[in-house]
Swiss-Prot record:
PANTHER family: SEC-INDEPENDENT PROTEIN TRANSLOCASE PROTEIN TATC, SEC-INDEPENDENT PROTEIN TRANSLOCASE PROTEIN TATC, CHLOROPLASTIC-RELATED. GO terms for cellular component: chloroplast membrane; TAT protein transport complex. One of its GO terms (molecular function) is proton motive force dependent protein transmembrane transporter activity. The chain crosses the membrane at residues 30-50, 76-96, 107-127, 157-177, 188-208, 214-234. One of its GO terms (biological process) is protein transport by the Tat complex. Coiled coil: none annotated. It comes from Cyanidium caldarium. This is Uncharacterized tatC-like protein ycf43.
Length: 239
């Protein structure tokens, strides 16, 4: 049967499944640790890249160990991102035996697409969104006070900005999942496009606290492009 659980070559006992989980977990942790070591060996270069959007700002260490613990956070976050392809691969290999052929055809491409879109969102945020937001806060009130920032608070802001943009790039994944589960369809999504335009505009204004309408329009158009691209995918699959 086409929808039957994976064929005999994919069947596993409970013990084998637990052993597989242990092995995949170990390999994922090793990949993460190696990535963190690589990041820690290049921490000065990475910190310079993080500071790049805030050229001219003087950073302070406001408490003992602030820079040290922030450096650890940097190696952890970037280590996760760097090792994410291997971690995604381990997840996919682990879940395959428990999926039907139909579920495999749906879930595996979604996981791969989700990872690619997340990384694309991080890159988009670093190149376009974060620099604009940082410059806005630098220039706001600069005639009244001198901008001297805590490096920890700055890094937390950068992470929030990047991950907010990356999560917004997951919109197509949610749409395709909802469409595949028959919760909503492409016609329903298309019927509310006006509300989506307004929502994306508001979202862009929140994510980019800048008076520059061009960058807000840029992000809004990117979100709308992802939204309508997902509708097209659902239409192609008649969902």
């Amino acid at each position: 049967m086409a929808d039957k659980k994976a064929n005999d070559s994919f069947q596993m006992s409970i013990y084998e499944h637990l052993e597989e989980l242990r092995q995949r977990s170990i390999e994922s942790i090793v990949a993460l640790l190696i990535s963190m070591v690589v990041c820690s060996l290049n921490i000065n270069i990475l910190i310079e890249l993080i500071k790049q959007p805030a050229i001219g700002i003087k950073f302070l260490q406001l408490s003992p160990g602030e820079y040290f613990f922030t450096s650890i956070k940097i190696t952890l976050y970037l280590g996760i991102i760097l090792s994410s392809p291997i971690i995604f691969y381990e997840i996919i290999i682990f879940i395959i035996p428990g999926l039907t052929k139909k579920e495999r055809r749906l879930l595996i491409p979604i996981l791969i697409a989700s990872g690619c879109l997340f990384v694309a969102g991080l890159i988009f945020g670093y190149i376009y969104i974060t620099p604009i937001a940082v410059r806005f806060f630098i220039n706001y009130g600069k005639d009244m006070i001198e901008p001297i920032w805590s490096f920890k608070e700055y890094f937390d802001f950068i992470i929030l900005s990047l991950f907010s943009t990356a999560i917004s790039f997951q919109i197509p994944i949610f749409q395709i999942l909802l469409g595949s589960l028959k919760i909503i369809n492409s016609k329903m999504m298309l019927s509310v496009w006006r509300y989506v335009v307004v929502g994306s505009t508001i979202f862009s204004a929140i994510i980019t606290p800048s008076t520059d309408p061009l960058i807000q329009l840029f992000l809004s158009v990117a979100v709308m492009f992802l939204y309508f691209s997902s509708i097209l995918v659902l239409k192609l699959f008649k969902l």
